[in-house]
Structure formats: C-alpha cells, structure tokens
Amino acid sequence: MAETSKADGGRLTTHVLDTATGKPAAGLSIALYRLDGSARTHLKTVATNADGRCDAALLAGAEFRAGEYELVFAAGDYLRGQGTKLPEPAFLDSVPIRFGMAEAVHYHVPLLISPYGYSTYRGS
C-alpha cells in the first residue's frame, strides 16, 4: 500500500492474524479510542472480515487527526469463538495497543495473536 499524501488527510488501518492457526482472524471486534490527556473517547467499533481486515479504514480523510490513539482487540472473545479452550480468566482477553500518529500519512497497526502471546508493529 502506498502512503497517503498529507493532502489526503492520512488514514489508519489494521488487520489481525491468528498465529496459532496461521489464518486471518475473521470476526474479531476492534474498538478505536482517541486519547487526550486522561480522557479516552470511543470513536467506533468494527469487526474484521474473512481476510482479517476491516472493510474500510478506521480513520481517513477529514476524520483523521494527529494524536494518541488506542485500539482494543477482543482477542479472548475471538479465540473462544474459534473453540480455543482458555483458562478463566484468560491470559489474553482484551489486547490494547496505544500509539501516536504525528502526521497525515498512512498508519497500519497489525496484530498477530495466539492464546498466550501477541505482537504488533507499524506496517505499511
């Protein structure tokens, strides 16, 4: 994917891969929050499609603002829905990822999950 120009206003995307099965994590719920000091504002909740991606950018164009954000991935619900036996409480249930976006370009924040671990990075 090419970076979005500053004139386009930037965008935020994500995708989720289940590293235990080697497949996209379809149907995983993701909540997006904007952080402003101690305030945390819910912007939207979406679910991943069959490819583990969201059907549209989480933020794009006029919706995009530089700042601090948080994505909360409902990993436990997804894993239980796949038939994965998890202890109660689950080792990983909600997986929060906090990050900053400083300029109006494309930010891609993927998540790789399994019942006992996860990783993320700034993708392209």
From Swiss-Prot:
InterPro entries: Hydroxyisourate_hydrolase, Thyroxine_BS, Transthyretin/HIU_hydrolase, Transthyretin/HIU_hydrolase_d, Transthyretin/HIU_hydrolase_sf, Transthyretin_CS
Family under the similarity heading: Belongs to the transthyretin family. 5-hydroxyisourate hydrolase subfamily.
Subunit structure: Homotetramer.
Listed name of the protein: 5-hydroxyisourate hydrolase
UniProt cross-references to Pfam families, sorted A to Z: Transthyretin
Organism: Mesorhizobium japonicum (strain LMG 29417 / CECT 9101 / MAFF 303099) (Mesorhizobium loti (strain MAFF 303099))
Enzyme type, top EC level: hydrolase
Catalytic activity entry: 5-hydroxyisourate + H2O = 5-hydroxy-2-oxo-4-ureido-2,5-dihydro-1H-imidazole-5-carboxylate + H(+)
Function: Catalyzes the hydrolysis of 5-hydroxyisourate (HIU) to 2-oxo-4-hydroxy-4-carboxy-5-ureidoimidazoline (OHCU).
CDD domains from the UniProt entry: TLP_HIUase
Residues at which substrate binds: 15, 53, 121
Hydrolase as UniProt keyword: yes
Keywords: Hydrolase, Purine metabolism
Annotated GO MF terms: hydroxyisourate hydrolase activity
Additional remarks: HIU hydrolysis also occurs spontaneously, but more slowly.
Superkingdom field: Bacteria
KW Transmembrane helix (keyword) present: no
EC number(s) reported in the record: 3.5.2.17
Annotated GO biological process: purine nucleobase metabolic process
